[in-house]
Amino acid sequence: MDGRSQALESDVKKTMGVRGLINSFVCRITRVSLILGMGMVVGVGMASVNFEEAEGSNGTKGAGGATSSREELMTKSIARDAAATVVIYNSNDPEAKGLADFYCEARHVDPSQEIPLATPLSEEISRADFQSQIEEPLQREFVRRGYWKFSITPLDPDRRPALVATRIGFVALIRGLPLKIAPCAIPVGGTITQPSPYGSCNAASVDSEISLLGLFHHPLNGVIPNPYSVSPVLEPGSAKGGNPSVKKTKGGNSPAASTSFPTSGNRRKSIPPGLLCVARLDATTTDGVRAMVLDGLRVEREGLWGFGYIDLRSIKTGPYGLGDQSIRIAGESMRRAGIPVLSDDLPETIHAGFPVTDAAAYYGWYSGSIDGPFAEPSFRFLPGAVACHLHSFSASTLGDPAQGWTGPLVRHGAAASIGNVYEPYIGFTTNFGIFAWSLLAGHNLAESYYAAQPVLSWMTILVGDPLYRPYLGLLGWERDSHTSPGVSATRSQKWGKNPHDPWRDYRRIVLAHRGSTLEAASDLSHRARETHESLYLEGLGAAQSDAGQLTKAEASFNAAASLTKDPDTAFRILLERARTLEKEGKPARGAALLSKEISLARSDIQRALLDSWLTRMSKL
C-alpha cells in the first residue's frame, strides 16, 4: 500500500470511531434516484417516483400510505437531488467561487456543500497532479465531512475499511477546473493486462475519474465498466460483448452486451455507493454558465418545445453502425414523446444554409469541428436545448468557440452537451439513444448521461447542470407558460400574447395515438388545415420519410409547403421535398423542383447549398 493510501485509510478509521459506529446504526442516508435506490419509474406523459423516506421528511401521506400527489413526489425528488449534490470549484480561478455560489443559490444546494480545490488553470493536467491536487484532497474531504460511510469487512484479512454507503450522488464541477488527464508512461516494472490499442491508455477526462473517487485503487489503464449504464459494452468493430480491454475491478460485473432498447426495469439493482454522477458547468464565458443554469430552470417550468434534429450517415452495419443506431433511437424516442423530429441522412453533416430553426434538441455526427448551420454566427438553439455531436475529440477543449463541438454548441445556446476529450473509440462513447430516452422519461442530465455511458475512467464528459431535467415540463409539471413573463420572445412574436401553441398541440395529437406519428397522420393533417400551420405536416412528412413511406411523405411535404409563410421554413421544406424525390429514385424530378423554386434561396449560402444539391442529383 502506498503512502497516499495509508494516509487515507488512517483518516477513514478515525471517522469510524464512536461517531461512525453511532451513524452506522441510526443514520438513514438520503438516497438519490437510481444510483442509491430511489427507483424512479417514469413513462412518457406521466411519472411516478418510489423512494425511501429520508430522516426528517415531512411528506404528506394519504390513505394506504401513498404520497398525496405526483407533483409532490417530483418536488421531493428534486430537493433530494440538491441535498445529494456537491459543488467543486478551483480556488485559483477568481470567478469560480462566484459561479459556485450562484449555482448553489439557483439549485437550492446548501453552500456548505461547496468544496474548493487549488488546481492549475490549464485544461490538461498530469496524472500525478490529478492525484495530489484533485483525487486525494476530495477523498479526504468526503471522509472529513462524513459524506461516506465505511465498515470493516470481516472477510478481508487486512481488515481494511470498505465504503458501504454515501449521502452524495451528484457532482457539479465549476468552470475553471482542469478538463483532462494527460497520458503517462507505464511505471518501471508495470504491466499491461489488457492487450489492445486502448488497453494501455491511461489518459482520461477529469470528470470520469472523479466519478470513481469511491472505488479506491482502480486500474488506470483501459476502461472500467459502468455499473450504472444500461447500454452495451461492445468491442469496437464487433457486435459481441466480452471486451478484453474492460478493466476488472473487485466485485464488478461486466455489462451485458445487448442492443435491445432499455426500460426502467433494466437498471442495475446494485450500484456501488462510491460511484458519483459528475457534470461540468462550463462554457467559454462565465455569463454562458449562468445562462445555462437559468435557461434550464425556466425550461423546467415552461417546457422544452421545439424541433428535434438528428444528423445520420445512413450506416447500417459495422462499428459505425452503432453511432447511427444510437442517433436514430434518439430521434425515435423524441417522436414517441410527441416531439416533431427532422432528420438528415446524407453522409455529410447538415449543410451550411440548411435552416435549423426552433432547435430544442440535436444529435448528430461526424466532423472534427462545428460546421454547417450551427457554425453560423447568428445561429442560436432554443434556451434549455440539448445538443450532442459524436466525434473523437469533440471536447478536446472548451475554451475555443470554434474548435470541436461541445464548447461551440454551448456557446450557441445549448444548455447541455456531451463530448470526448481524447479518442474514446466508438464502442465506448455515450449512447445518444439511451441518453435521449432517459431524459424524456424525466431523469436529470447526470442520471441520463451515466445510464448511457458504458465505461468510466475514460474520455467522455457531460457539460451542463447535473440536476437539469429538460423534459420536466412535458411530464405534467409545467406551469402555464402562455402568460408566463418568461415565455420565449420568439414564440410570443409568432403566435401572439395567448397563442394556440402548435408544439403542445402536436404532442397531444401524437400521444393520443400511443406515440405513433404515423398513426396520427389523419389528425395531424386535419389540424394543419384548421390552423394553417405547416409544423404538423412537416413533422409528419419527416416521420413518413424515415419510415420509408416516401409517397405519403411527398404528399405531406407538398401540403406543408402550401401553408408556410416563413421564408426559412419554406426553403427547408423545399429541400425536404427534393430529398424525398431523390430517395424515391426520382432525382431528375427533385432537381427540376429545386430549379423551379430557386427563388426561395434568399442568401448566397442558401444558393450555394441549392447548387450542390443540383450537382449531386444530376449525377444520379
Describe the function of each predicted region.
Residues 441-514:
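Caspase-like cysteine protease fold
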